[in-house]
């Protein structure tokens, strides 16, 4: 299958964003022969035209300082790409300041050989009702819909969520990953590829790892949104400004994840949550999911953070330690 990434668009993006950091074509070839791709010292941004999503997505790639990308680099595909860099069009006008996180990791007494591939979500405006609906539809695991007991709720998910243009998981596996492998001269698989997300981004991340265990070896979810949405609240959201959880959706997600317990072999999963706002609903479901995800030969970290909620300011504080734990197992999880 031909790469969905336009060669012209990528060339222009590379020349515009990181001209000084990229080698010449000749240097690229020699580096490839030596088993390493060009070093990135800034954010590389380019666009992919997705046939699956029928949309164009901006991709941002950033690595730790002084790291040459190769098969030894730990790559993380991250949802809600704008949230990592641009506070002007993100939830609550805040960003995770990824560059500061990577610098923090590089100063630790260990190698932080990692790169983050941040994919912009369908939420172009950062706050629009329709944009948020499409983002939710893309990030909700499609195969979990079968486990929703309420027939009306299940029908709603079938009509709104389960559509070809909302299949973000297929986009990641069939379009994004082959593009990254081609551009950066790498082979991505469970030994060097993880996935990270916040809220709904954490939900689709765990789903991707479990449905594609040969591709993803780790998953990081910060304040993963386990409880879905109450459809009545959601339809009235523009008026009421409030949205509550759906226990039936949460139960469906637990049943969906339970079928993958055998896929947890040799997997690494980080899950955290707070006790404010939406996060206050999560603990009962997290405890049940912990029993599903915990196996003899898996690595699982589940952490609760007191007085923290469903906001980027809290995720920003926790991102570095989550990434470091996946690579080095250097924080206490209890």
Describe the predicted segments one by one:
Residues 20-21:
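C-terminal motif of bacterial Sec signal peptides marking the signal peptidase cleavage site
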Residues 1, 16-17:
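Detector for intrinsically disordered, low-structure N-terminal pre-sequences
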Residues 1-9:
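Bacterial N-terminal signal peptides that target proteins for export
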Residues 26-334:
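Non-catalytic cap/lid and distal C-terminal segments of serine-dependent acyl enzymes
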Residues 8-16:
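Sec-dependent N-terminal signal peptides
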């Amino acid at each position: 299958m031909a790469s969905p990434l336009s060669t012209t668009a990528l060339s222009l993006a590379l020349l515009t964003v990181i001209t000084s950091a990229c080698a010449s074509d000749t240097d690229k070839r020699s580096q490839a022969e030596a088993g390493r791709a060009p070093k990135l010292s800034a954010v590389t941004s380019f666009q992919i035209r997705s046939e699956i999503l029928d949309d164009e997505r901006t991709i941002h790639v950033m690595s730790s300082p002084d790291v040459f990308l190769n098969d030894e680099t730990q790559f993380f595909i991250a949802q809600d790409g704008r949230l990592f860099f641009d506070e002007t069009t993100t939830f609550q006008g805040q960003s995770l300041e990824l560059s500061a996180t990577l610098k923090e990791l590089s100063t630790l007494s260990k190698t932080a050989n990692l790169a983050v591939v941040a994919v912009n979500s369908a939420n172009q405006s950062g706050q629009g009702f329709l944009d948020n609906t499409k983002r939710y539809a893309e990030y909700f695991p499609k195969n979990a819909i079968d486990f929703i007991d309420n027939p009306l709720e299940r029908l709603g998910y079938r009509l709104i969520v389960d559509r070809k243009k909302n299949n973000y998981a297929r986009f990641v596996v069939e379009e994004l990953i082959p593009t990254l492998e081609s551009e950066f001269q790498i082979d991505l698989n469970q030994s060097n590829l993880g996935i990270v997300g916040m809220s709904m981004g954490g939900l689709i991340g765990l789903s991707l790892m479990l449905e594609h265990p040969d591709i993803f070896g780790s998953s990081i979810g910060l304040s993963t949104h386990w409880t879905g949405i109450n459809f009545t609240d959601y339809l009235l959201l523009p008026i009421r400004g409030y949205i509550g959880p759906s226990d039936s959706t949460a139960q469906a997600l637990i049943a969906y994840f339970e079928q993958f317990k055998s896929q947890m072999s040799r997997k690494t999963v980080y899950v955290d949550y707070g006790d404010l706002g939406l996060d206050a609903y999560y603990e009962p479901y997290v405890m049940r999911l912990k029993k599903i995800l915990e196996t003899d030969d898996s690595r699982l970290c589940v952490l609760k953070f007191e007085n923290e909620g469903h906001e980027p300011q809290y995720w920003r504080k926790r991102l570095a330690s989550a990434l470091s734990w996946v690579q080095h197992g250097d924080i206490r999880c209890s």
